[in-house]
Amino acid sequence: MPSSAQNVGIKALEIYFPSRYVPQTELETFLGASAGKYTIGLGQQNMSFCDDREDLYSLALTAVSSLLRKYAIDPNTIGRLEVGTETLLDKAKSCKTVLMQLFGDNTDIEGVDTYNACYGGTNALFNAVNWIESSSWDGRDAIVVAGDIALYETPAARPTGGAGCVAMLIGPDAPLVLEPVRGSCMKHVYDFYKAYFKSEYPLVDGQFSNTCYLGALDACYQRYQAKQRARQAAKTNGTAISNGHQGSFLDTFDYFAFHAPNCKLVAKGYGRLLFNDFKLESGSFDEVPAQVREADFAASLTDKALEKLCVSLTKERFVQRVEPSLTAPTNCGNMYTASVYAGLISLISNVPSDRLQDKRIGMFSYGSGLASTLFSFRVKGDTTEMARKIGLQDRLSARTAVSPEFYDQMCKLREKAYQQRNYTPEGSVESLAPGTYFLVHVDDAYRRKYDMKPYLSMCEDRHEQAV
């Protein structure tokens, strides 16, 4: 039996996003929106998308095969594989079983799929960590996959789409250690759901969903704080805070990554944390603004003036602690389950390893319906090699911009392909980056066949074969 695992967390990270994107400035014009509505109003710059050549399975195959290749991971060292997604292609067969093709003769791998809107990846992460910390652990590592394609039918929601997949190697002695405290909020609401099975488009109440997100954040933050204080673990990091405030619970987090339906909502969410501190620990501040002091918690969720005030009061901290996590979200759009982990990848790509050591990274994961958790990582190892292997900025820069008209055509192509059998995709293989898996054909029995676009070098990897 292996000895008890210590410092369990993320040992390696990989991200995949499609090779083409549509600029949000051009989408504003195409959809008849005012200039800046998407870029300033939503905080989005570009949006990734897929044609009918890519789907959840291809995204996950690409991300996991790349993780195995870049980090030279022996498939036999993996004992658990979990997938979090809401982009379902089959109501019975899991995406995890499709990924088993990458693991050769190693069929002794636990785990399946988890789904609840954008939250499934986080639940998969917790499952993997709990397995490694349990008496059932056999000494091997786990891989967690979070990936989705976000696509909306109505013009108002179109700019909040996106696509991407994150693969994480989970194990002991990790540089990103999952801390034990977390606060969760689970409720029954209909803010966003996919009950109409004849379309991949969701049913959405956008404003209500934003309110649900912020209300869940309140509850998770308060519960995390209460549990952390109960463990006598909460302490400030000694960082000077603007507006003369220092010592609030918000300052126990050196950095923060949020689930990002859009980056403007992230800024509102971060401001909301300070509002909670003002209300719940007013003694930590020299002065609490009257507008905050008099606000009711429930009514404050839709108070735009209060929202602006809190965003303004946290602006300096936001730039230092949260903005580094927004590179992928603002350039790729909403990746649903992968979103918060794309934020984590952005953070370690933008902040040098030496500045991250022993820092706490707050994480807020939200999935409509709803399921949410606020948790944290403590950095206890070098992240330099991880950031180098990811190569986030270079890969973002290597993408190709397309027109909104072309994007609209690809949306129609996906509509045509949805739930079809005897179907051969029409999308371009040439546009895909080397190492990308793509759909070749769906046969008469709905069985899907994939292949991989080869790397430019002649070197072949044993994990990357036609499947």
Curated annotation (Swiss-Prot):
Binding site for (3S)-3-hydroxy-3-methylglutaryl-CoA: A35, C118, T160, S209, H259, K268, N334, S368
Active-site residues annotated for this sequence: E86, C118, H259
SUPFAM superfamilies: Thiolase-like
Keyword Transmembrane helix (UniProt): no
CDD domains: init_cond_enzymes
PROSITE patterns: HMG_COA_SYNTHASE
Physiological role: Hydroxymethylglutaryl-CoA synthase; part of the first module of ergosterol biosynthesis pathway that includes the early steps of the pathway, conserved across all eukaryotes, and which results in the formation of mevalonate from acetyl-coenzyme A (acetyl-CoA). Erg13A and erg13B condense acetyl-CoA with acetoacetyl-CoA to form hydroxymethylglutaryl-CoA (HMG-CoA). The first module starts with the action of the cytosolic acetyl-CoA acetyltransferase erg10B that catalyzes the formation of acetoacetyl-CoA.
PANTHER family linked: 3-HYDROXY-3-METHYLGLUTARYL COENZYME A SYNTHASE, HYDROXYMETHYLGLUTARYL-COA SYNTHASE
Entry protein name: Hydroxymethylglutaryl-CoA synthase erg13A
Organism: Aspergillus fumigatus (strain ATCC MYA-4609 / CBS 101355 / FGSC A1100 / Af293) (Neosartorya fumigata)
